[in-house]
Amino acid sequence: MIDLKQLRENPQAFGDRLRRRGGDFDLDRILELDAQQRQLEQQRSQLQARSNEIGALVGKKIKSGIAPTDPEIQALKAEANALKQKLSDLEPQERQLKEELESLLLTIPNPPSETTPIGRDETDNVEVRRWGEEYKPTYPCQPHWDIGTRLGLWDVERSVKVAQSRFVTLLGLGAALERALIQFMLDSHRERGYVEVLPPLLVNTASLTGTGQLPKFAEESFRCADDDLWLIPTAEVPVTNLYRDEILAADQLPIYHCAYTPCFRREAGSYGKDTRGLIRLHQFNKVELVKFVHPETSAAEHEALVADAEFILQALKLPYRVIELCTGDLGFAAMKCYDLEVWLPAAGCYREISSCSNFGDFQARRAKIRFKGAKHKGTQFVHTLNGSGLAVGRTMAAILENYQQPDGTVRVPEVLQPYLKCSHIGGAKS
């Protein structure tokens, strides 16, 4: 959620920064509702103060020996009753204003950071760096969906029978490779200081609202018909909300968590895109990295988060590039974001495999995650960050394509061989 105080104090500058995303946002209506709400709060405060004053005055007069039936006492009590009615009459007005204001605030995205490149869409994103040499074999290069089918790593047709399209059942070494990747990613992140979490796969509406998926992306999520529960689109949601409505001690920060979960997305707007393979599924596995940090270290923690995701790609020796998203391509809740894109030789292009976002205090305001330190009076909102470390299915796709051999086998990356107990998939060595 945006900082309403910032908008109130400098609406022009705030609006200019927000409009770098593109689109039109009704900030004037928010300011109007905010002013009305503050006016009602002031009115309530004045009425309550007078009510308290009358209560004290009546008590003092009765204590001095004046009878409760005295006309002066009766007049004060009548005024007190009138004030009580006025306070009661304010409640529905305040409630309606609060609901409308909060509803509007939930639709406003996070303003981009000052260092985010300005642009309209993904064509204006900025390449930051590349790692590794693009694999371009001299022999015919198969796409991962053909490799996986040929080697018996999954069964798509039966998955459609069991569920529908965009689901896959992994088999044999396909299932083993997926499991090996998950374990390797978790082991690596734990060694780098992350505390592993195994969270619920179903969350309530408040959790999805806290991280920014609701109300904007309700159509992208799977919802249980009879309960206030949703299947998670990413582990970011349950892990971030572990600390919802909490005040942390400053010395608890930073908090680093890693989590493996299946993720579920309807992909409502992707009809006809990536219909084959592991790139775009309704259910997929992902290892997520989530950080809760002090605002002063937020930018440095973001760069470190990107490095942690890059570590997995480098350990697997998969070529990739780092892209900084422009203002027009930022996710709803992010103020700054880097995408890691892995090289897929069959397609001859890079595809996103991790998105590492700094949300500033945007999610923390929605989820009410604060901290209290000795140097500051009151509480402050933490900064939250998260990134994929990595999307497991897309990592498998990249391995199958980048490690395919002329004899039709797939060489297993060295770091995964202890997990799989083999050096190749397919052929005599598997």
From Swiss-Prot:
Molecular-function GO terms, alphabetical: ATP binding; serine-tRNA ligase activity
Family annotation (SUPFAM superfamilies): Class II aaRS and biotin synthetases (SSF55681), tRNA-binding arm (SSF46589)
The organism's place on the tree of life at top rank: Bacteria
Secretion signal span: none
Localization in the cell: Cytoplasm
CDD domains, sorted: SerRS_core (cd00770)
GO biological process: selenocysteine biosynthetic process; seryl-tRNA aminoacylation
Keywords associated with the record: Aminoacyl-tRNA synthetase, ATP-binding, Cytoplasm, Ligase, Nucleotide-binding, Protein biosynthesis
Pfam family, one: tRNA-synt_2b
Enzyme Commission no: 6.1.1.11
Residues engaged in binding L-serine: T234, A235, E236, E288, S388
Cellular component terms per the entry's GO annotation: cytoplasm
Reactions catalysed according to its record: tRNA(Ser) + L-serine + ATP = L-seryl-tRNA(Ser) + AMP + diphosphate + H(+); tRNA(Sec) + L-serine + ATP = L-seryl-tRNA(Sec) + AMP + diphosphate + H(+)
Keyword Protein biosynthesis: yes
Keyword Metal-binding appears in the UniProt entry: no
Function as written in the Swiss-Prot or TrEMBL entry: Catalyzes the attachment of serine to tRNA(Ser). Is also able to aminoacylate tRNA(Sec) with serine, to form the misacylated tRNA L-seryl-tRNA(Sec), which will be further converted into selenocysteinyl-tRNA(Sec).
PANTHER family to which the protein is assigned, alphabetical: SERINE--TRNA LIGASE, SERYL-TRNA SYNTHETASE
Annotated domain remarks: Consists of two distinct domains, a catalytic core and a N-terminal extension that is involved in tRNA binding.
HAMAP family with a match to the protein in the record: Ser_tRNA_synth_type1
Subunit: Homodimer. The tRNA molecule binds across the dimer.
Family assignment from sequence similarity: Belongs to the class-II aminoacyl-tRNA synthetase family. Type-1 seryl-tRNA synthetase subfamily.
Name this polypeptide is given: Serine--tRNA ligase
